[in-house]
Amino acid sequence: MPHDKIVPEDEQYLFAHPEPGRSCYDTHADGTPVRYSSRRRPLFNVRPGFPNWLTGSYRHFPVDMYIIEWLEHVGIGYHVATDEDFEREGRALTDRYTTIVTGSHPEYWTRNGLDLLEGYLNAGGRIMYLGGNGFYWVTSQLRDKPWIIEVRRDNSGTRCWDAPYGERTHVATREAGGIWRSRGRAPNKMLGVGFASEGWSKGCGYRRLDASYHSPAASLFAGVNEAIVGDYGYVLGGAVGDEVDRFDIALGSPEHAYVLATSTGLGNEYQLVIEDLTLSLPDQGGAQRPDMVRSDLVLFAIDGGGWVFSVGSITYGGALAWNGCDNGLSRLTANVVHAFTGKGPVLGET
């Protein structure tokens, strides 16, 4: 029997009060997409410990707090920078740091932001991408009002609405909207992994691959005795879950990368992303297409001295914090951050 629909109090308030504004996932009353949003909008459901309606678990800001908790546990000093900080200060900001650690879901990036990160890596910077579905949508900021963003989904990617014909070019920057992959900048090229699947049932862990045992990168697994890491966590029960990214050479992932581990297997609640489908086909879930519906743990060097460590999963932070941060995944990630921030070579390279 169907269940009664229950609308949470915060959603009831937003239905009755239009003054807080809408997000870029909404449509207007006439059905047209909402293309602009602002960080000045009051957010009633974003705070530490607030469960997300989609998963019944944590998402976004609460998961980022697990990453902060983990950084403090392993004794790594950090500063927090926002999108506006990046846009305003550029390399003057990033060049002060050896390593940039992303949040759990860095989905919306501007062209300037991507250029900044690429320049930082090419100059020897290190990035730890500790999330999933990152660097996905073409995003613009208004020059005179940088707290406002513009998103035009351009009928591409896994999306919540379509941009009508004639309305797919950003007003702020006069560039085409859509996903960066369609613009020739798939995140695989810079981060080694890119969006592969989404689903909001139970997560899973990573199964270590040969590179984690028999390559220079094996040194990062010091203190990690498990063959499967991250099969635990405060978010969906595993380090791999929610929205996940895979290593894919066809999409630009570097051939020289160390693929250290891959997800142990997601269920059919996790479906292949739309941009990977050319036909409407059955059997595109995690159990039927583990070759595509997966998350990969990847490490690679950049010409010029830069390094990238990518995990390809939104729920990773919840596994880092598991058991008071005393677990194999936490030790692995701590080894990476110490290697990235230390004064010596990352893997003994000269």
Regions found by a protein language model. Give the residues of each.
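Sequence-level detector for tyrosine residue identity
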Residues: 13, 25, 36, 58, ...
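Glycine-rich, aromatic-lined ligand/substrate-binding cores of catalytic
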Residues: 144-147, 152-335, 339-340
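Aromatic-Pro/Gly-enriched surface loop or interdomain linker
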Residues: 1-93, 345-347
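Residue-identity detector for threonine
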Residues: 27, 32, 55, 82, ...
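A broadly tuned preference for mixed-charge, low-complexity surface segments
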Residues: 1-27, 123-128, 133-136, 150-163, ...
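Generic signal for short, ordered secondary-structure residues
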Residues: 50, 96-99, 290
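Intrinsic-disorder/low-complexity accessory segments
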Residues: 1, 6, 60-66, 103-104, ...
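Helical hinge/lid and interdomain linker segments adjacent to catalytic or ligand-binding clefts
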Residues: 56-143, 320, 348-349
